[in-house]
Amino acid sequence: ATRMLVSELAGKASLAAKAKSLGIDLSGDARTLQAILDDVKTREAHGYSYEVADGSLAVLIRRHLGLYEPHFRLESFRVIVDDREDTGALAKDAASEATVKIHVGDRRIVAAGEGTGPVGALDAALRMAITEYLPQVANMELTDYKVRILDEEGAGTSATTRVIITTSDKRGSWGTVGVSENIIEASWNALVDSIEYGLIRAEG
């Protein structure tokens, strides 16, 4: 494989260059740069992959710099996967229904949505909840998602799942990543990064 992990490239210099391409200058802060690099390495060891997840990497860097202010906060979510055709509870293409409870500022919103697979259902429910308050979300479209089971052999239901989401707006597209033993949680984490980064792009 010619593709290398971000952490295996030229270390700090590579990460600083990547951050610069995302509009973030890390050149004058060696300590923070090292902390971010260590975080990336740790996450990659747990299954994260940032080569096609610029959105998640940008959010991660902003967290370290104290520049990340979430636009919404999750209270809880619930996803029901239609298993009538014996597709398996983790089937990414099974008809699904999601309900989310979200806080935007001091508002609490409960919304439901339907979609193909847990990602589609969560995306529909989240948009239903927040678009009225964050209208830029209407310009974003979930264009692709990939689910990969990591360490599959012998892991059974505890196998780690990586979800990569591609989202687009009028100016381009970006990828985000979520990793968890629970496909729903991995999907949610990737989805939140995708919306948050899209809002950061819209504001920038």
Regions found by a protein language model. Name each.
Residues 1-204:
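Terminal or standalone catalytic/regulatory effector modules within metabolic enzymes
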